[in-house]
Amino acid sequence: MKKYFFKSLANFCSILVALALVYPDAYGQTNKSAKNKTLIFFFDGLRPDYITAELMPNLYAFKQKASVGMHHHSVFPTVTRVNSASYATGSYPGTHGLLGNAIYFPAVNKSKAIGTTYEDLMKVQESESNQLLTAVSLGEVLQSAGEKMMVFSSGTTGQAFLQNHKVGNGAIVNPELILPESFKSQVLTEIGDVPQKGENGYGKHKWVIDALLKYGLKNDGPLVSAVWLSDPDGSAHRYGIGSKQAISALAFVDQQFGRVLDSLQTRGLTTVFNIIISTDHGFVTHTGKQNLTDFLISQGLKKDKDSDDVVIAEGAVYVKDHNAENIKKIVSALHKENWVGAVFTKPKKKGSMQGWVYGTLSFEAIHYNHPRRSGDILVAPNWNDEINDKEYPGTDFSRGVAGHGGSSPYEINIALMVSGPDFKSGYHDTLPTSNVDITPTLLGIYGLPVPTQMDGRIMSEFLKKTSEPARKSRKETIVTEVKYPWGTYKLSLDMSILDQYRYFNFSKVERIQ
């Protein structure tokens, strides 16, 4: 009897093993989602209206089958380095402390803002006791879980580095920065030297995708690969939105995206790769002539370009010793100027949406109130709906040909598309989402804890495996105004609210004579 029992038990176990091999999910093997890899793909400066069958056929076709975020947000200020740090940390600048493409750290330079190249960021890191960002990043969380992240970027060294600033067991591959240093010779040997800029500079995009195909898109590759192509941003800055050069750049980066999709298909990896598509910001046409530094000097509110009484870092204004009277004078002068849009200051009290200076809204309203690094004033250029010569709407009063950084819907409202084994197909999400939600969502997919300091949320509505009930968001408008002898300055800020999460949609200024 005992012999018969053990023989039967052995047969039963054999059957279970066979079934487990055929139906692994049903028999408690490692969570399937933990095996799926993720590709994050950013097209720098991608306006939603670029995604058409004519301009970007590969991305357009992808969008038809993907799930789409209909109400996705760039992080304000709508500049590249803010958004690379924000998506990487799942946090806003008020939390992670990287406040612009130009930044002010007096320990590095007392009288001027500095850039955000890798070399600049290393100076900041040294001056800040090795704490470049005051928030934990996706790369750090993955490394602590025994996983890794690789970044493939054709943009600036700073943008590439901020996506995984600790690097750890991962890597960064950029035409001007390869980390760790020990990986550099291997990349240059196997991928080849970075192409010369040439007429249009597109070679760097292909080189970066070559590296992705070699090191990222494979079964034993990193759990997360992040790609960031610096066009159409570069071409639109120089030649304008809708210019033939910008259209050509769109076509080229779309072809590179097509190469990635083809490679996933050829390698049989489409069923094990999630893909998240977005951008750092939209774009507007520029028509301005004013410069903030020159304006303050002309008004007697800053001594000269090299003085440290007032330091300008893009739209951020740092007033020496936080002198309240000088801050008020600067705000008053800005309110009168038609080229100036929204003006923000520190909160009237903790958590307040109103700024402490009359006629301003708070840094809290825009997630900008870093305890140590925020300036005293933040200024956005005024904007309108004017259409450029190529029929693209959205104009502001910054200098140059075209760009971003402001608080218009043309810069804040951006594309989001997701596809893959962990995401629903063909779902159109009307809830507000942001670039800060990307990292928490990935951590949710992989069953990793979301650090408490992260500001973003898990976009559970996109996930196949979700038990959360349907939710609704609401709109809210915050208004402030102040009267002057010349008239009234009125500032409105439109936001979407989902539970405890606030999303900045746009701001609008009226001057009433």
Region roles according to the model:
Residues 34, 70, 77-79, 101-110, ...:
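Secreted, luminal/periplasmic, and some membrane-associated catalytic domains
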Residues 34-48, 61-63, 87, 142, ...:
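Beta-strand elements within well-structured catalytic alpha/beta cores of enzymes
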Residues 48, 60-61, 140-143, 314-350, ...:
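Non-catalytic, well-ordered alpha-helical segments in soluble enzyme domains
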Residues 51-98, 102, 148-151:
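Short, structured active-site-proximal loop/turn typified by the sulfatase FGly-forming signature C/S-X-P-X-R
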Residues 92, 98-240, 335-338, 511-512:
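His/Asp/Glu-rich, glycine-adjacent segments
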Residues 297-333, 399-440, 444-445, 465:
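Substrate-binding rim/cap in mid-to-C-terminal beta-strand-loop elements of soluble/periplasmic
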